[in-house]
Amino acid sequence: MPIKSDRWIRRMALEHGMIEPFVDHQVRRGVISYGLTSYGYDMRVTDHFKVFTNVYNALVDPKQFDPRSFVDIRADYVDIPPNSFALAQSLEYFRIPRTVSCIVIGKSSYARCGIIINVTPLEPEWEGHVTIEISNTTPLPARIYAHEGIGQVLFLESDEPCEVSYADKKGKYQGQTGIVLPRIDP
């Protein structure tokens, strides 16, 4: 399952709409970098964040998640409380080809500050805005900047198409826009 290069990513983004909007180079000056890299794509985060709070003393249960556990914030940056987390959304909309699976890893600028990014794999034929979990592992507030890089998407291509894609199984997060909270199929 080889990793795909900048040439392949550019071609798929421009000819097949795999990444929209697409930045065909890496933007680095004065920002957390974003755009096309040698073997990946640094996606950005929007200005919409859901910051975890324990105002209602709710239990965190993925099967019965209480949306009141979050405070909605729209801003150029967000400060995540110590030892807490926020959810955010990628600026880019992704359309993953049937023979490709993607993993997302955090940006070193954030990781070196104790900020960890978690995203589950982008499966074959999944499409949507990525919901991103951002953890502040430090005992201090941690700042995240909107419209700047948040994680690098690596594209891994199989030597054959999968038998059942995310679209085929009608995955519950297919076509998601906005920040999507946990869902359980009925």
Swiss-Prot record:
The EC code for this enzyme is 3.5.4.13
Q: Where is the active site?
A: 133
Keyword line: Hydrolase, Nucleotide metabolism, Nucleotide-binding
Q: In which pathway does it act?
A: Pyrimidine metabolism; dUMP biosynthesis; dUMP from dCTP (dUTP route): step 1/2
Q: Which GO terms describe its molecular function?
A: dCTP deaminase activity; nucleotide binding
| Entries under SUPFAM superfamilies matching the protein | dUTPase-like
The source's superkingdom equals: Bacteria
GO BP terms, alphabetized = dUMP biosynthetic process; dUTP biosynthetic process; nucleobase-containing small molecule interconversion
Stretches of the chain forming a coiled coil according to its record:
none
The reaction(s) this protein catalyses: dCTP + H2O + H(+) = dUTP + NH4(+)
Q: Where does dCTP bind?
A: 107-112, 152, 166, 176
- Which residues, if any, are the signal sequence? none
Q: Does the keyword Magnesium apply?
A: no
Quaternary context: Homotrimer.
Briefly, what is this protein's role?
Answer: Catalyzes the deamination of dCTP to dUTP.
State the similarity comment. Answer: Belongs to the dCTP deaminase family.
What name is this protein filed under? dCTP deaminase
